[in-house]
C-alpha cells in the first residue's frame, strides 16, 4: 500500500493526515468511547504525530507512509464504533458551502474544538458513559503519552492544542478560514445557517460537550479569524 501514495501531492498528504488525527481525537473523547476505541485512538494519534511530517517532507519514505496507513485504519476503527463530534459536524457544512478540502477544514477547526471540549459543558450529554466530565482529562492524558508538558490537566490540554497548531504550521495548513480564502462578507452572511446546520449534523450527538448553537457559531468565528 505505501507504494501507491509515494507520489501523492504534499497538500493532500497534509489534509488527509490531519483528517486522521481528527478522527482519532474525536473518537477518543466521544461520549460513546470505550476501552477498545481509546486504545485505537491513542495509538493512531501517536502515529500521526510521529509520522505525518515525515510523509509530508519525504513522500517516498515507505515506512512513514505505512505507519500513516495504520493510523488511518486504527482511527477509522475507533470512530466507526465511538463516532465523531462537532469538528466533523462543522467541517461537513463548511465543505458543502465553500468546497475546500475536508481534512484542511478539520485541521483548522481542531485546536478550537479541543479547547472548547476541554471546558465544563453548559449541560451534560443525555447518555454519558462516565460519571463526570472527563474530556479534559483524556486530552491531558494523551498529551502526556505524546511526550508533551503536562504538570496539570489544563497545561496538558494547552500543550495538545499547541502541538496541533505547530503541526498545522509545519504542513503549511492555513491558520484560519480567512487565510484559507473564504471571503469575510460571505462567511458572516452564512455563519448563522452554518451553525444551525452543524448543530443538526449526526456527529454532534456523540460530542462530549453538548453544544449550544451560539457556541458553535463562536467556534466558527474564532476559526475564521484565527483567534
Where are the regions a protein language model picked out?
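Carboxylate- and glycine-rich phosphate/diphosphate-binding segment that chelates Mg2+/Mn2+
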Residues: 1-82
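Predominant activation on well-ordered alpha-helical scaffold segments within soluble catalytic domains
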Residues: 18-26, 42-53, 69-73, 87, ...
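Flexible, glycine/charged-enriched surface loops at secondary-structure junctions
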Residues: 32-40, 55-67, 82-87, 153-157, ...
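Short acidic alpha-helix initiation/capping motifs at coil-to-helix transition points
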Residues: 43, 85, 165-173, 193-199
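Glycine-rich phosphate/pyrophosphate-binding beta-alpha loops
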Residues: 73-106, 201-206
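Gly/Pro-rich interdomain helix-loop hinge
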Residues: 100, 104-186
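Short, amphipathic C-terminal "tail helix"
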Residues: 186-227
Amino acid at each position: 500500500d505505501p507504494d501507491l501514495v509515494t507520489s501523492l501531492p504534499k497538500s493532500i498528504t497534509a489534509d488527509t493526515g490531519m483528517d486522521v488525527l481528527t478522527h482519532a481525537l474525536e473518537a477518543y473523547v466521544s461520549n460513546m468511547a470505550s476501552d477498545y476505541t481509546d486504545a485505537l485512538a491513542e495509538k493512531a494519534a501517536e502515529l500521526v504525530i510521529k509520522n505525518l511530517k515525515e510523509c509530508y517532507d519525504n513522500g517516498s519514505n515507505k515506512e512513514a507512509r505505512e505507519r500513516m496507513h495504520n493510523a488511518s485504519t486504527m482511527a477509522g476503527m475507533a470512530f466507526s464504533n465511538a463516532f465523531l463530534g462537532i469538528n466533523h459536524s462543522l467541517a461537513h457544512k463548511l465543505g458543502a458551502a465553500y468546497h475546500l478540502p475536508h481534512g484542511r477544514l478539520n485541521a483548522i477547526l481542531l485546536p478550537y474544538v479541543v479547547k472548547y471540549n476541554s471546558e465544563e459543558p453548559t449541560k451534560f450529554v443525555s447518555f454519558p458513559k462516565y460519571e463526570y466530565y472527563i474530556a479534559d482529562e483524556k486530552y491531558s492524558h494523551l498529551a502526556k503519552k505524546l511526550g508533551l508538558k503536562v504538570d496539570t490537566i489544563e497545561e496538558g490540554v494547552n500543550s495538545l492544542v499547541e502541538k496541533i497548531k505547530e503541526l498545522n504550521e509545519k504542513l503549511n495548513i492555513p491558520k484560519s478560514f480567512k487565510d484559507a480564502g473564504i471571503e469575510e462578507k460571505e462567511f458572516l452572511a452564512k455563519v448563522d445557517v452554518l451553525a444551525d446546520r452543524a448543530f443538526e449534523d449526526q456527529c454532534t450527538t456523540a460530542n462530549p460537550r453538548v453544544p449550544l448553537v451560539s457556541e458553535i457559531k463562536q467556534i466558527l468565528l474564532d476559526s475564521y479569524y484565527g483567534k
